[in-house]
Amino acid sequence: MRVVLQRSKEASVTVDGEIVGQIPFGLTLLVGITHEDTEKDATYIAEKIANLRIFEDESGKMNHSVLDVEGQVLSISQFTLYGDCRKGRRPNFMDAAKPDYAEHLYDFFNEEVRKQGLHVETGKFGAMMDVSLINDGPVTLIVESK
């Protein structure tokens, strides 16, 4: 499982002109799932993200988690995170999980994040989405389970 995490001042995702998910501040997650991922991977990533200290304390040091600052999470599925661009000029997506499996694991992952005590908004799985955010910092990290 691969997640691109962005600390966000605000974020939203729109499908067909309608906002389907929106947060005032917190973390924007682009979530990629490979066919080898399991629920154990999803739980690991959810716990890691909820407790990752990437928000600044009063002295400007990254010392607080999204839980500590009472932020929210916008989670967006993105199979293209498993695109392999090493050969040719078109990405190969063979490492991305099949849609049925990926959707199940994506939903499970979001529930695991909620179990950590976070409010989670989502995009629409498999849809073409417009994602808008103000990246705070910018702070952008890649979190992987393997």
Swiss-Prot record:
Single annotated GO MF: Ser(Gly)-tRNA(Ala) hydrolase activity
Gene Ontology CC terms: cytoplasm
GO aspect biological process, one term: D-amino acid catabolic process
InterPro entries in the cross-refs: Daa-tRNA_deacyls_DTD (IPR003732), DTD-like_sf (IPR023509)
Cellular location(s): Cytoplasm
Record keywords: Cytoplasm, Hydrolase, RNA-binding, tRNA-binding
Pfam families listed in its UniProt record: Tyr_Deacylase (PF02580)
EC number: 3.1.1.96
Transmembrane segments: none
Source superkingdom: Bacteria
Recorded catalytic activity of this chain's protein: glycyl-tRNA(Ala) + H2O = tRNA(Ala) + glycine + H(+); a D-aminoacyl-tRNA + H2O = a tRNA + a D-alpha-amino acid + H(+)
Primary subcellular site in the record, as a coarse category: cytoplasm
Motif (Gly-cisPro motif, important for rejection of L-amino acids): 137-138
Subunit structure: Homodimer.
Function (record text): An aminoacyl-tRNA editing enzyme that deacylates mischarged D-aminoacyl-tRNAs. Also deacylates mischarged glycyl-tRNA(Ala), protecting cells against glycine mischarging by AlaRS. Acts via tRNA-based rather than protein-based catalysis; rejects L-amino acids rather than detecting D-amino acids in the active site. By recycling D-aminoacyl-tRNA to D-amino acids and free tRNA molecules, this enzyme counteracts the toxicity associated with the formation of D-aminoacyl-tRNA entities in vivo and helps enforce protein L-homochirality.
Family: Belongs to the DTD family.
This protein's domain notes: A Gly-cisPro motif from one monomer fits into the active site of the other monomer to allow specific chiral rejection of L-amino acids.
Protein name, entry field: D-aminoacyl-tRNA deacylase
The organism's taxonomic lineage, starting at the top: Bacteria, Bacillati, Bacillota, Bacilli, Bacillales
Gene name in the database record: dtd
